[in-house]
Amino acid sequence: MYDVLIKNGMVFQSQQGTFEKKDLLIQDGLIAQPRDTMQHPQTVIDARGKYVLPGLIDEHLHLDLNGSMIGANGDTVCIPNCVTTACDGGTCGVSNFPQFYNSNIIRYEANVYAYLNVSTFGNKSLCLHEENHDPADFRPDLIERLFHKYPDTLRGLKVRMCRATLGNYGMAPLEQALKISAKLQEEGFHCPVVVHYDDLPKNVSVQQLFDAMRPGDIVAHIYQTKGETIFLEDGSIHPAVQQAKERGVILDDCHGRVHWSIPHLQAAVEKDFLPDIISSDTVRISEYVKPSFSLLHALSVFSAAGASTERLLQCVTINPARALGIEDRAGILMPGMPADIAILDIADTQMVFRDRYGNTAKGNKLFIPLLTMVGGRVAYRQIFF
């Protein structure tokens, strides 16, 4: 007997970026192969007129709730927003990642992965003097030890390239992170370098930063507005950024409240320069606080900027699954995959979206969470669904 039948829904084929009206069967926590004859399932969910997706993936947010001032609660920011898989964006380094793993990661309802911060203490608070980015203090020996201990959970190394962290170090922290990553990749670990790009100091340029990135590495906050941005004075995309994307560097919107503007999103959509990934970059002080407070809200803002629904949904399903190296367990709805499922309503809207600078955009599509299923179990459901 099947456990669950989700019927009549428009199922998102994330690899193709298309919808298909079909039923989904779930058995023992996995998506099941339909048979010609079958017994009536225990639970039937009628998704007529709704959209059935792989559980959404929030590839960059901060979830060290018990050990960091910036850590959000994964159970309140993920599950109600149809997020079944999340990756912590480097909140912790070698000195405190085990605490984060034991206190939060293994306890959250969603499947949580993490980037390891190259700074030993990670990013524990929002203050003037932030994490230590002296490359001499990065401790590659301890980083390697943690990758051996948590090979399935750790998905890369995080380094913040911004005025607040770099001081006079210039490109040295990124160069050291790339060396550590290369050694771990040689040992068979999935270990891209994830760069927080924002308000670069004068001794680091967009050209230098993007030229250093390798295929599979990730640049977060690509639509940020401080200092040198990805846009040249004439509004075109910086050639180094364009070339990085073409050679396989992964570009992450990494939304947050402060790392984007409506004009930047509109300019990117107009130039067909969408990100590979959209993530929420939620931190504790931004949980459900406007101008943007969740992954679904970020999708709605991008829709208001003119992006197509199908491409946006790939940015929160198959694309981050590939970037994290977990496409064998997330981001796709097919038999044998875990039954991590999102059901949404995608409604027309006249809602006006605002950024932190006061810019506005009239809404297009609103992404409304109806049901979240993790491992075949309903973890969240709207009262009217």
Model-flagged regions — what are they?
Residues G67-T76, A136-F147, K202-L209:
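Short, acidic/polar
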Residues P263-D348:
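His/Asp/Glu-enriched, well-ordered alpha-helical/loop segment
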Residues G9, P338-F385:
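C-terminal cap of metal-dependent C-N hydrolases
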Residues M1-L53:
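Histidine-rich, glycine-flanked metal-binding segment
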Residues M161-V289:
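Active-site core of metal-dependent hydrolases
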Residues G9, G29, G49, H60, ...:
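Divalent metal-coordination and catalytic microenvironments
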Residues A47-R107:
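Metal-associated gating/positioning segment near the N- to mid-region
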Residues N81-C87, T91-C92, R107-P135, K158-T165:
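Metal-cofactor-binding active-site regions of metalloenzymes
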